[in-house]
């Protein structure tokens, strides 16, 4: 009899415009992993979606690499594993696919290495590997989270924000935009006054969300100075999507993570017509309504 670890890991959207590398929200698109020990001589992978089939099956596989990294940190050996994978999180689109895989890898190492990590420790590990908590924190906990990683003390602090009472639309282009390429578009330095201005906007936006003032929050989400002005030109459809969203009185249109996916906070009474208008007019993308995920990663052990 072998135990199967089943994981359902949500997607995430980072930044919400002005919360660069610090704010993220979990979404109901999922990476599904089913993991069990194998009698083979190496790790095995079974992919059930076309996008995952492009992933490596050797030791360069990201999940394998992270799981072994975690196992080594806690001085445990992992058995050879068979991982079945199905994902509806598009790769390299700004929806946290790498963060979902990272969290999955930590859970795999934790279970098959019998490490007994708490969720807090999972967060610390994930952020240390990722470098910032904006995707991994909501992936682990669900909901909308603001966080800070101190790279000196290696400590991550997070705070939960009320789930926004808005409809969320994602407009997903057909092309990829690697995070590394998107980061190269950013300036190396900001002036002190620029940093103060952007920080003030971000702080006020969070307060507006906490007060459920979505008019103000949306207005501020679109005034980022940290990354949006330098990345929007990488997404050919951004201006058209923002124009259509504005015509439907949306609260905000921003880049999801590093892009190229575009995130819209919509009024609930307008979201259906808005998503249909986007699909009619922006034919190089697929737009869809996505629920905010409130539970984070789900783990289940199946006994066979």
UniProtKB/Swiss-Prot annotation:
Major location category of this protein = cytoplasm
Reactions that this protein is recorded to catalyse? L-homoserine + ATP = O-phospho-L-homoserine + ADP + H(+)
User: What keywords tag this UniProt record?
Assistant: Amino-acid biosynthesis, ATP-binding, Cytoplasm, Kinase, Nucleotide-binding, Threonine biosynthesis, Transferase
- Enzyme class, one word? transferase
Q: Which InterPro entries match?
A: GHMP_kinase_C_dom (IPR013750), GHMP_kinase_C_sf (IPR036554), GHMP_kinase_N_dom (IPR006204), GHMP_knse_ATP-bd_CS (IPR006203), Homoserine_kinase (IPR000870), Ribosomal_Su5_D2-typ_SF (IPR020568), Ribsml_uS5_D2-typ_fold_subgr (IPR014721)
Q: GO CC terms on record?
A: cytoplasm
Supply one GO BP term: threonine biosynthetic process
Q: Where are the transmembrane segments?
A: none
Q: Which residues are involved in binding ATP?
A: 90-100
Q: What does this protein do?
A: Catalyzes the ATP-dependent phosphorylation of L-homoserine to L-homoserine phosphate.
Q: Which family does it belong to?
A: Belongs to the GHMP kinase family. Homoserine kinase subfamily.
Q: Which protein is depicted? A: Homoserine kinase
From which organism does this entry originate? Staphylococcus aureus (strain bovine RF122 / ET3-1)
Gene behind this protein: thrB
């Amino acid at each position: 009899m072998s135990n199967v670890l089943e994981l359902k890991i949500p997607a995430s959207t980072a930044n919400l415009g002005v919360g660069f590398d610090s704010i993220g929200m979990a979404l109901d698109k999922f990476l599904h992993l089913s993991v069990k020990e194998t009698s083979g001589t190496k790790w095995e992978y079974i992919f059930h979606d076309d996008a995952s089939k492009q992933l490596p099956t050797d030791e360069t596989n990201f999940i394998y690499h992270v799981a072994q990294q975690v196992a080594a940190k806690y001085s445990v050996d992992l058995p050879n594993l068979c991982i079945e994978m199905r994902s509806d999180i598009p790769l390299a689109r700004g929806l946290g696919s790498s963060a979902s895989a990272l969290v999955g890898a930590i859970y795999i190492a934790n279970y098959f290495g019998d490490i007994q990590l708490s969720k807090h420790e999972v967060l610390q590990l994930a952020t240390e590997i990722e470098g910032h908590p904006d995707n991994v924190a909501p992936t682990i906990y669900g909901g909308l989270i603001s966080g800070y990683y101190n790279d000196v003390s290696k400590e991550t602090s997070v705070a939960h924000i009320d789930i926004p009472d808005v409809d969320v639309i994602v407009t997903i282009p057909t092309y990829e935009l690697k995070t590394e390429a998107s980061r190269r578009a950013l300036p190396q330095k900001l002036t002190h006054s620029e940093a103060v201005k952007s920080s003030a906007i971000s702080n006020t936006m969070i307060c507006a969300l906490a007060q459920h003032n979505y008019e103000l929050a949306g207005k501020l989400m679109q005034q980022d100075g940290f990354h949006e002005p330098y990345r929007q030109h990488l997404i050919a459809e951004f201006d058209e999507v923002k124009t259509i969203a504005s015509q439907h009185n949306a609260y905000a249109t921003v880049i999801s993570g590093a892009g190229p996916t575009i995130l819209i906070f919509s009024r609930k009474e307008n979201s259906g017509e808005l998503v249909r208008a986007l699909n009619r007019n922006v034919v190089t993308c697929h737009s869809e309504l996505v629920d905010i995920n409130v539970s984070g990663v789900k783990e289940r052990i199946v006994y066979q």
